[in-house]
Regions:
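Transmembrane-helix signature of polytopic, membrane-embedded enzymes
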Residues: 289-292, 311-332
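Exposed low-complexity, polar/acidic, P/S/T/G-rich flexible segments that act as propeptides
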Residues: 30-36, 69-70, 74, 88-90, ...
Length: 393
């Protein structure tokens, strides 16, 4: 039996990984499996109350029986972003009662708004100010069984890599390939999880530079691109709202706002770090991708550059390969490599340059290679272009 498992360990691993992922998804959906229900309409419990010289919507519902609310759903039209509060009488895993408060937002971009509550309650009260030109048309709650594709993809990737680390010992002889696979999988997950909004430090500035560089003479500014550049967005915190955001940005990506003429066709050396991102943005337009997909595609250019450079840094390193692997897979470095930024070029080029320097200084066989020294200087130079403060160092 054991020998058979060893012989077919990869097939067994696939089956086990699929089962574990399915079990986790079932556990996360356990409240829906045990007591699931479709939309419970709370609109009939909605009233408009006066508070001073203002009006507010109040939706108050209580039940003699405990019930599970996975998601709250509000529908309506609003002139801008407003907060609403949720008061619940809820029960924890030990059946201890408590009164809790939560808040979320509605906005002018969408007509449907969602809040993940995931609580067992006996009462819920939603309060939302009623400004001029605002209308709340419907409120409901639900506890539906739903497969979360993002969670499924994450655990499939995590378990697969865990299997490789524990049972595929050959991979330790090729640490650069372990890095490449890990960075590619989790980098892509980061890119497609974070949605078409600003996420990393100063990402709106870096996107602006990459977007401009992706055009030759005239820059076609769409409403969606300007939303990213100007950090004009709305608050989203659920899958359903992010789906609405993608649809909104895709439509805004078709709206031409104005054309900006480039002063210089030849790019400055300070923007060389954005070339991979600009190339992939350009390819996204050539292939007529939606704005959301094009925005993610531009980040893939940055990720592939990071993987390529650090792959060779780990591969050619004479010592401390495991340390380099740990360094390159640190969450911040991988997150930046999956974003719009110049830091990826700075970090990866400097790292590869340092590896070449260490190899030449401490592990040379006969004499120092002039070609490698020139290449090392070139790496340091290009890496310093975006952050000139490093040049004196």
């Amino acid at each position: 039996m054991i020998e058979t498992i060893k012989k077919h360990k990869r097939i067994v691993a696939v089956v086990v990984i699929l089962i574990l992922t399915a079990v986790i998804e079932l556990i996360c959906n356990f409240p829906a499996i045990r007591g699931g229900y479709d939309d419970l309409d709370l609109t009939k419990y909605m009233t408009v109350e006066e508070e001073g010289n203002r009006e507010k919507y109040v939706i108050s519902y209580s039940s003699p029986q405990k019930f599970y609310i996975k998601e709250l759903h509000l529908s309506g039209t609003f002139p801008k972003e407003y907060y609403y509060t949720i008061k619940t009488k809820e029960y924890n895993s030990f059946d201890k009662e408590s009164e809790e408060y939560y808040s979320d937002t509605v906005n002018s971009w969408f007509s449907d708004f969602y809040t993940n509550l995931n609580k067992k309650v006996t009462s819920v009260e939603i309060t939302l100010n009623k400004p001029e030109n605002a209308e709340l048309t419907a409120v409901s709650c639900s506890n539906k069984f739903e497969i979360n594709k993002y969670r499924v993809l994450f655990f499939l990737a995590a378990f697969s890599l865990l299997y490789c680390l524990l049972f595929e010992k050959k991979i330790y002889k090729k640490l650069e390939w372990l890095f490449a696979v890990y960075a590619l999988i989790f980098g892509l997950l980061l890119i497609f999880y974070v949605q078409p909004v600003k996420n990393s430090w100063d990402e709106q500035i870096h996107f602006d530079n990459a977007y401009k560089l992706s055009f030759t003479k005239n820059i076609d500014w769409t409403e969606a691109a300007l939303n990213i550049k100007n950090i004009n967005t709305v608050t989203c915190n659920t899958k359903a709202e992010y789906a609405e955001l993608r649809e909104y940005m895709n439509q805004a990506g078709k709206v031409h706002v104005y054309t900006e003429k480039k002063e210089n066709i030849v790019p400055s050396y300070t923007v060389l770090a954005y070339v991979p991102q600009a190339i992939f943005l350009k390819l996204g337009r050539i292939f007529h991708f939606s704005f959301s997909l094009m925005y993610a595609f531009g980040k893939i250019g940055n990720l592939l550059l990071y993987i390529s450079v650090m792959f060779w840094a780990i591969k050619i390193a004479k010592i401390k390969q495991l340390f380099l692997l740990f360094l390159t897979l640190m969450p911040t470095n991988l997150f930046l490599a999956s974003s719009y930024t110049y830091d990826t070029v700075v970090f990866s080029f400097f790292t590869l340059g340092c590896v070449i320097w260490v190899n030449e200084m401490f592990f040379y066989e006969s004499k120092t290679s002039a070609k490698k020294i020139i290449f090392m200087i070139l790496l340091f130079t290009i890496g310093s272009f975006s952050k000139a403060v490093y040049i004196p160092i």
